[in-house]
Amino acid sequence: MNKLIKAEFYRSMRSGIFLPIYALMSLFTIYMTFLTYRDSSLVDGDGYELFAFLASYSEGGVMVLGEVIGIIISLMIGKLYSDRFHYYEIMDGANTHHIILSKLIVYNIYSLVIVVVPAAVSYTAVAVNYGTGGIEKPWLPILLLTIIIMNATSLVLLLSMIIRRAIIGAVISYCYAMIIIMLYMFYDAEITGVSNKFTGFLFDTSPYIQITKLGYDYTSAEYIAMVAGSFVVTVSLLYTLTYISHRRKNFR
C-alpha cells in the first residue's frame, strides 16, 4: 500500500501537465483567499469579519476551482488506463482495494492542499486578528469544507476509474457540475427554495452546491447531516462500483 501511494505521488509529480497546473492552482487559491481576507478586514462590525470571510470564500470561485481539479484528475486517471499502467500494478502483486485506496489518498491530499490549507490559514488569521464574532464552533466550517472537497474529489476520481477514458471522464465531470450549477441558478434556491423534491435533493447532496452554502448554513444540523451523509453514501457506492468494475476485468 505504501509503495502504491509513493508511486502515485511520483507519477503525478513527474507528469508534464499536472505539476505546473497544480502550482498555478495553489497560487490562485492563495491569491483568492488573500482577496477574501482583505475584503473581510474592511468590514465594520463586532466580529463580523470572520463571517464575511467565510461567506465570501464559499462564493468566491471555490466551486470553479473544485471543478478544475476534477477535470485534471479525470485526465490523469484516464491517461493511466490508456497507458495500461494498472496492469503493471496487478503484475507487481497489488490488489484492487489497494489500487483504489492509494489513488483516493493521493488525489484527496492534493485537493486538500490546494483548497483547504490556504482557506484554513486565512480563516485562522481573520479569527486571530478580529475574533470569532460569537461564531459557535469556529473549527466546524473548515471541517465541513474538508469533507465537501474530499467528496467532490472522490466522486470524480472513482467515476474516472469506472469510465477509464480521460476525455469522457473529464466531460462527464464538467457536465455534471455545470448542470447542477445551472439548475441551482435557475431555481434561485437560496432565495425562493426548491419545490421539486428531486431537484432539491440533488442540490443538497452535490458538493458543488454544498460549498456555496457553507458560509451561511454551517450551523444547520440538516446541512451538516447532508454534507456528512452524502460523502459517506457517495464514496461507499462509487467505491463498490469501482471495485466491481475492476474485478470483472480479471483484477485481483
Question: Where are the model-predicted features located?
Answer:
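Aromatic- and glycine-rich beta-strand/loop motifs that create alpha-glucan
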Residues: 1-25, 251
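Helix-capping/transition residues at the boundaries of transmembrane alpha-helices
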Residues: 11, 78, 89-91, 156, ...
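Short loop-to-helix capping motifs
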Residues: 15-16, 94-95, 164-166
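Alpha-helical transmembrane segments and their helix-entry boundary regions
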Residues: 18-21, 89, 99, 168-170
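Short hydrophobic, aromatic-rich alpha-helical segments embedded in or entering the lipid bilayer
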Residues: 191-215
